Curated annotation (Swiss-Prot):
GO terms for molecular function: ATP binding; heat shock protein binding; unfolded protein binding; zinc ion binding. Pfam families: DnaJ, DnaJ_C, DnaJ_CXXCXGXG. HAMAP family: DnaJ. The gene is dnaJ. This is Chaperone protein DnaJ. Belongs to the DnaJ family.
Amino acid sequence: MSQRDYYEVLGVARDASEDEIKRQYRKLALQYHPDRNPDNPEAEQMFKEAAEAYDVLRDADKRARYDRFGHAGLNGNGGGHGFANADDVFAHFSDIFGDLFGFATGSSRMRGPRPQAGADLRYNLSISFRQAAKGDEVTLRLPKKVTCDECNGSGAAAGTKPETCRHCGGNGQIRQSQGFFQIAVPCPVCRGEGQVIPTPCPKCKGSGILQQVRELAVRIPAGVDTGNRLRLRGEGEPGLHGGPPGDLYVVVSVEQDKTFRRQGQDLVITHEVSFVQAALGDRIEVPTLDDPVTLDIPKGTQSGEVFRLTDQGLPYLGHHQKGDLLVEVRVLTPVSLTKKQEELLREFAKLEEGKPFEKVKKVARKIGKAMGME
């Protein structure tokens, strides 16, 4: 086609970098593209010359031969000979712009079905508070996709096999024009597979996959909380065409407990004591995740006061460290008193005015005895 100097055609120096050559070619190709210059043979000629020049200068081997021997160094060596027709130029243009912009172009070829990773699966698991606190092993029943044993995964009925898609010629892609670009899109007939199944397998309906139910043992670590996700690699759906399987995500939901309330890895309980116990102090027994433990309530304990028992909470995930048990004391006020109890309380009230400590303490003990606390 052109015998003009290729560097002159693109408007770059002879020592221009590959990136500079790409940028300049892109600029010229957009400027002189026939869609932007209808009925302009001069622009079409410039477009073709730019494509020919870029075809040589982008290739290190062709460029080296051109730099040394000029156009003569390209004769019979796949470069500098021009393009047979306009389709060659546009295909070349699409190839280059696909390379420049990172999208698939009309020259892209699919080499048969591509490996596809399997889909990830989600399983919502509800467990008891005790299971979350101590950890447990549970068995999940999950849907499972397996290769059809009738067609060995081909999807074709016995005695038949998949055929090359006639619509795309087995490429899995067809060309479509968008403006002055030609891009490649998946073939609508074979859905990008490059092949079709004329007679589908009756067992799997042509999918090559069967649905089954499987059982999977899952270890629940101690300390999990609602919303925690357990990832089981490779336990999702199988991949297609040799692709890797997906993962299984077990999303945990922990049921509420009647005794314990959760605050992170700490546990909270409310323990009721009489006002005599609160006033004089006492030793009480409180529940834990294991056996009950003894807690000393000091004299003068107020309702709502919280006592902390260290390492009696929930374990941190992946650690031996545990949270604490918080015991919130609630002081009960008696609602039904005997006559003697009322008299003692009135005596207590009188003594409270002057606060003679020993006498108050003595009456308080009497009240406790009258109420069956001692």
